[in-house]
Regions:
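A structural signal for short, hydrophobic/glycine-enriched beta-strand patches
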Residues: 2-155, 159
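A transmembrane-helix-recognition feature enriched in membrane-embedded lipid enzymes
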Residues: 158-178
Length: 178
């Protein structure tokens, strides 16, 4: 299931990227933001877009994106170089908000997890964008050892991430089918 979830993406080195107008960081994991910031700092994007993702059941005051903007400021990123969407609750809303902010012809590098990238790419393309995917956090690279067959919190976490991703893909497949 993991292989299917991450297919067809492979890890990419920042040096191999072409320069884009924006590096887009989808909410959900600070590692996405760190990678997006590295892409920007290495001169591979003119600006950063972070999404103000916040799941409805979260009690936190700030969205992921608002926290990322604070981190960027602490790292010396000028405020005019980083954009943030309105609050969003899912990947489709992230894409719709970005579509309102920038021309569809913009060159985008999109940073998200490898298991999430197929769905994110599909939604960006359905919205008219052509993107360069920058997938991170691959699960497939892990070696199988005898410990792999012992139940663990990490295995449960990975299984739930993959299950949630397939649920999301099925939902959007069905939505766009009807």
């Amino acid at each position: 299931a993991i292989k299917q979830a991450e297919k067809p993406f492979v890890p990419i080195k920042i040096a191999a990227l072409y320069k884009s107008d924006f590096v887009v960081v989808l909410s959900g994991d600070v590692a996405r933001f760190e990678n997006g910031l590295n892409i920007f700092e290495k001169g591979k994007a003119d600006k950063i877009i972070v999404t103000a993702g916040k799941t409805p059941w979260e009690k936190k005051i700030d969205s992921d994106g608002h926290q990322y903007i604070k981190i960027a400021a602490q790292r010396g990123i000028r405020s005019e170089k980083i954009l943030i969407t309105d609050v969003v609750h899912n990947t489709e809303q992230e894409v719709m908000e970005i579509r309102k902010m920038i021309p569809v012809e913009s060159k985008l590098t999109v940073v998200t997890s490898a298991v999430h990238m197929p769905r994110a790419k599909m939604l960006f393309e359905k919205s008219g964008f052509k993107i360069t995917p920058f997938p991170i956090k691959f699960y497939l690279g892990n070696k199988i050892t005898p410990m792999s067959f012992i139940p663990s919190a990490l295995a449960l976490h990975r299984s739930s991430k993959i299950y949630r991703e397939f649920q999301g893909r099925f939902y959007y497949w069905l939505k766009h089918l009807l």
